[in-house]
């Protein structure tokens, strides 16, 4: 059968069919609008090529006739279809047909809802109604009618209103023609249940039950009369009616009475105590039988233990001679139940008693024959035959009390999760103790010694109180106990079978050796394969396998059996030899590499086997154990700083474990509900199920016959190479006689499933229908090296922009203290970003934007809010989950994902607590979906080019065949015809055009997109370090590696959202901790251009080498399909270069008519710059330069505040002026003359240079707060920058020098970007040291321009040892020199750098100070950073072994940046040999003050005798001081003596 190709349009009757369907559904629409739509519709061709095939009549006559008839029928329908009749333009809607008229607008010139004005109907609401024209139409009539013609504007208005609604809303396919998802056209089971319930409720209950008796009576009366019976026959009819009515009435009363009784019992159950006579009767009879057995069991179990614990000192042995609890059984006095405790909880109060001495409830015979409880402890005194056993008796034991029992149900058998026990009151405990004398002469010391009984009771209550007395309770986790007894996997054993040598097969004739290895364990994990086999090697005695098999083990106290078999085609496989390995050796050495052992059969050697064993245990969750340890440490009074270090270590471990993607999944399939039964003819199913992981079947569930809601409750454990990428597929079949039919399927990743189940949802939805109840638990495993799962590049489907505006924290948190909230962003429970915390506020304003790449519509974004705690674990505030499927959807036409809403709307979401209960806390967020264009990778592009060539050849062959058929048709036209077929190349073209084909040059033209980075291999230096990758100005790492094994990096994947590719940078950081929180944690750091990395590592992997570390990386790039706004590009962030020139006509603030003006520059209420002070002038000239970091031009506000300096008291405000930076052009220089809001103006010059500001530390526990940020990339990170990055503490600062100086100067003022220079233009020593610490060494590994820094490795800081390291820093408040009018108006720049010390003669004047001389000195405590929240500085002077306290500052509270400003000064007298001792005290209001540490400064050090400030490490932070020592009263430096001439030669 052959044919030719032709292009045709769709048949015209198809459009008419859709229009007819619209008419049927939308009958309430104006007919005029429908007709106009029909006349104006354009039946354009679909754009696809249709194929007409030429069919030979002789070959297929029947098909030809059918096709011809169909074509002619379609043409006749199209020709005969008349155009719809035009309706009069006078047709309108009238008010009587409108619905919800109370929501329609009031009267207006275009028509209204009534003839009576609203002022007349509701005069109170329209006392001041605006004037308007009278109604144009009288719409008070109650039936349709034509009142007036509609104008063109009215018709156009009606058309526009109706065209606003899309076809999907007006004509939903569910109402037009619903079809079954399986394609069988059967109705939905859920809909069938609804219809059945409606029929039973309305037709049966309401109609049949109410009128059936009446209709029956009437029918039989007519029947009897028709037959000819007399009226006496009515007696029998009414008798039957009465019988039926009585039965119905009795049934109705019985059911109603039963329902009312149930409701009453449930409501009164918690108000009364139930008696348990039946239980007590059972216990009294059972106790007599069981008590002797219990007594003997206690003696048999306890006496062997007591035999070996004799204390000595004359006591030879201990033993229980007699143990009985008496003949009276314990009783339950009553049970009180609480019915409203929750869905899965039962709570009861049990009143119990064990009182054998009470005979009030016993008969006379029982009281006479009763046996009292008695415990006799025999103590043997002496040795050998000179010994005597003395009994110690405990008698008359009585216990009674009231206990609350709370049972929480679970999902796993026995369906009890936790049992909580709590004593509601101290129990009654009474007994008699006879230590001496036995039964005859024994004396009860409990009643003889006064106060002893109450003392013993108090000891008992004090011990059980913390466990059982309210509010404490003892929790027994039944699930954990059952899990501990079950044989769960504790790890994975990787068995590598390398090879075998000299294998000896059987002596059978023509036998060849075809070996394979079978691995078995003694105790296999339930649900796993008992045998694991290697491949078969044919006809070889020295096979080479090099295969690795993974075995799940539940214990290492077993043996591994390795058997080598010889494969036989017909005969049974024969055993060549076997080998047993003791796995207990892996406890000491988890790696047994390159092992060799003999395969033996009996005592004969059958060959040599080479193998390797690697043991990977499960990472234990020690959170509960560590919580108990913290509680014990707190009870023992451990130091707070130790607890804080422990908490930080636990957080690092938790963050590290969250990155592990390999592990063991424990999957329990419980049951499936609401399966589709319409495919079954009988309505009953015989379901079975199959579970697949990454396409491999791992479990087959048994078939359950004739059950529509199967319940398996079977568990399997399986090794999953990637929790996020592995595909989980569950298929449920109906096992029929003719085979299995698929009735339900569910497919997702394990990460998505676990996230869904963690949201308090017990099931997942299958397709087409079915609720699948699953339990999935995860156990992480660290598999490194060659055993780590190779990462695969997952295709993203888009990116979600998450904007967190602000939050309102309500409700009480556990603990005492201020609320310092911050939030984290998680994707499928993996933390991607942590924001900064906002100090002491319940309404934090974050204004942060987060970009999160999305790879599955089942992923869930989670926002968690915490309260930052300086000491201890952060407190949980609440969380909210945002399913990604609510943000975007899949376009059915293009197959691409698009956003649900075009506009960005702010949503108010309420937070939920740990129990998923809604709280009063609110967060305002908005989400936007950014679609992407999938691009073929270089490897895929090669395969696509091959497919294109093959497709081109297929089309040529097809066209050639069509030409031949066309020629045959011209010769024999009666034997051929044109038939329409589907495009035979459509599937191939869709496969080729699934992604875009872009070259590297075309790809890098796209500014924004998702960068996929593959780390293939690598090593870190040192081997114990971690690798972090930061992007652009994002402070939180976009990638954190798993813990390397001996410094070797695992193969991992990272996805980063890039906002501007041309300016983007990647920062590779090697740190000591999992996440570096301080500069001391950084070992080395290197920066690369993202664009250069992409160019060099796009087609082939490349090696990166920096600071002893190296790694092999590969990059891919997926661009976005929409252009990001300028506010999200690099043009929105950068540095504002400001030159503060002068001020004119400023306000006078001093008595002399002048002011001492200086300027503060604020960015979002944060001071970033402070100018010099100009004395006694209203027209100051500053000529100072400042480099101001701007994190977001669209969100930041720059304010210039002019102040008048006062020596005493607060500075006076001279006015403010704001600068709009959002409208500045990049690189253009502007001249501004800003008018102050009071008087005068300031003259500025500046320009804006876009640049990503390099991220700093302290994301959560730092001091940068209340700043608008951008957060981006796969780990959603925040742009955090300090107000200056050019200066920091010098190398002399002990630990943390890289961060502290620059951080503190930001808040104190000064130009942080300048370096002090000497008069000849070279950097001074202090500035040079600072630049060495902060600046970066330029290196070019792999021919790339990179920037690296290697901070100094500092020792651990001990606050009890005085710190003698300090360094000079740039002055925050520079020395003010007397100036006159000429100097103030000169063009000379008066900058802080000009006041910095340089290489001058004064820099070494300390040599002129006389030894043991006394000099005056002044010390100014400027500020402290990250020392404590409430800090106080104590200054002392030490000399000659004596310590003298000279000053103590006021207690200052640190601001949001962690900076406490003092500006306090004191004087002292001392010799150069003396030392200044600076101590920090943490001021506590509710507890004792805490010493944070001390620092020591030698007054003879030349560094302190130069102008400037000094930074010293104090506690966990830094202290900035200024020392003026050794100068005269005029502040002049003593002259430097001349150097002798003999030393100058």
UniProtKB/Swiss-Prot annotation:
Cellular component terms (Gene Ontology): cellular bud; cortical endoplasmic reticulum; endoplasmic reticulum; endoplasmic reticulum membrane; mitochondrion; plasma membrane
Membrane topology type: Multi-pass membrane protein
Binding site for Ca(2+) 3: 1206, 1212
Listed InterPro entries: C2_dom, C2_domain_sf, C2A_Tricalbin, C2B_Tricalbin, C2C_Tricalbin, C2D_Tricalbin, SMP_LBD, TCB1-3_C2
Compositionally biased region (Polar residues): 62-80, 1318-1328, 1341-1351, 1361-1373
Domain SMP-LTD: 272-479
Biased composition (Acidic residues): 642-658
Composition-biased stretches (Low complexity): 1377-1404
Cofactor note text: Binds 3 Ca(2+) ions per subunit. The ions are bound to the C2 domains.
Regions of this protein lying in the Cytoplasmic compartment: 1-206, 250-1545
Positions in coiled-coil regions: 620-660, 937-972
SMART domains noted in UniProt: C2 (SM00239)
Positions carrying Phosphoserine: 67, 112, 1340, 1342, 1346, 1354, 1400
Residues with PTM Phosphothreonine: 1350
Transmembrane segments: 207-227, 229-249
Ranges in the topological domain labelled Extracellular: 228
UniProt keyword Membrane, yes or no: yes
Example GO molecular function: lipid binding
Amino acids binding Ca(2+) 2: 1150, 1204, 1206, 1212
Domain C2, first and last residues per copy: 470-596, 646-763, 783-897, 1119-1234, 1396-1514
General remark: Present with 4280 molecules/cell in log phase SD medium.
Record comment regarding domains: The C-terminal C2 domain shows Ca(2+)-dependent phospholipid binding. It binds to phosphatidylserine, phosphatidylinositol and various phosphoinositides. The other C2 domains do not retain all 5 conserved Asp residues found in calcium-binding C2 domains.
Name of the protein in question: Tricalbin-3
